């Protein structure tokens, strides 16, 4: 991982570099084609590792973002039904205290629960120019879903 001020370091080195108050995690969209129970189990193991290495940090599990309606309708794997199912499963990893689940989709979705066309140019990924909006939303408390 390349980290500003640290250069290229391992994930272990990042976790050892300081005590974090908050850790935001979004994983799993690329694993939708694999058995979900296995992916969720690995996700849980990753969260357990974070808890062990950063016991005082609040971990925020972010929902995976939806894809556009067109992509969802045409893709047997990367569609919003599968994304929602996966998000429901990872939400169960949260305990509501030190591990919290936050759904970022309302920030980028259209009125029908799909990634709005204006936020993407590939039907899947939010454009980089919206990352600051995303970060600001999380920092502001994500409408009460993430405590300051």
Predicted regions and their residues:
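Active-site segments of SGNH/GDSL-like serine hydrolases
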Residues: 26-30, 48-84
């Amino acid at each position: 991982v390349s980290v500003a001020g640290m250069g290229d370091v391992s994930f272990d080195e990042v976790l050892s570099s300081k005590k974090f108050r908050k850790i935001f995690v979004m994983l799993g969209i690329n694993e939708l084609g694999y058995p979900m129970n296995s992916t969720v189990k690995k996700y849980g193991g990753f969260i357990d590792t974070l808890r062990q290495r950063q016991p005082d940090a609040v971990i925020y599990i972010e929902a995976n973002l939806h894809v556009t309606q067109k992509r969802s309708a045409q893709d047997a794997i990367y569609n919003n039904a599968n994304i929602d199912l996966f998000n429901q499963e990872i939400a169960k990893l949260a305990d509501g205290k030190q591990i919290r689940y936050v759904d970022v989709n309302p920030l980028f979705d259209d009125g029908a629960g799909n990634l709005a066309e204006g936020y993407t140019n590939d039907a899947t990924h939010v454009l980089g120019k919206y990352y600051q909006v995303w970060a600001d939303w999380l920092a502001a408390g994500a409408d009460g879903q993430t405590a300051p």
